[in-house]
Amino acid sequence: MCNKIKEYWEKFCCENKIPNDTKYEAWSFGNTKEMADELADLVNKGIKTATTGAYELYDEDEEIPKVGEYNIILDGSGEPICITITRDVYIINYNLISSDHAFREGEGDRSYEYWKKVHDKFFSEEYRKSNKEFKEDAPMVCELFEKIY
C-alpha cells in the first residue's frame, strides 16, 4: 500500500484516537481518472453520501461493505482525498433503487432520471467487460456513508 495512504490513515487515527490497526479500505470511484476525481470531490464536499455497486461483479473473495467500516476515498491519481464511514448497506434490484438513493449519490442534477441515465451506461459497460449482460433487475449493493475526515 502506498505510503501516502498509510500516513493519511495514521494521521486520521492519531487525531481521532482510533487504533492504527483499525481496518480500512482505500479505493476510488468509477472507471476513469476523471470520474474518480469528480466523485471524490463530491464526497469531500459532503454532496455524495451514497454509492451503488453491481453485486454480480464482486470478485468471489471480495466482501460487500459493512456498516461501521472506514474508507479512504482516493482521487484518480491514487491520492487520499477524505475518509468515510459506512452507515448502511442493502442489496436491491437495480430497477427498484429509489430517487432518494439517486439524490444521495450527488451526481448531475441529483434527479433519478440523471442517475439512471449515467448508471445504465456505467453498468452496461462494466458488465460487458466481465462478459455478462446487464439487466434491469440486477442485484445492486447500495451503500450510504458519511464523510468524517
Where are these regions (language model features)?
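Mixed-charge, low-complexity intrinsically disordered regions
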Residues: M1-I83, V89-Y149
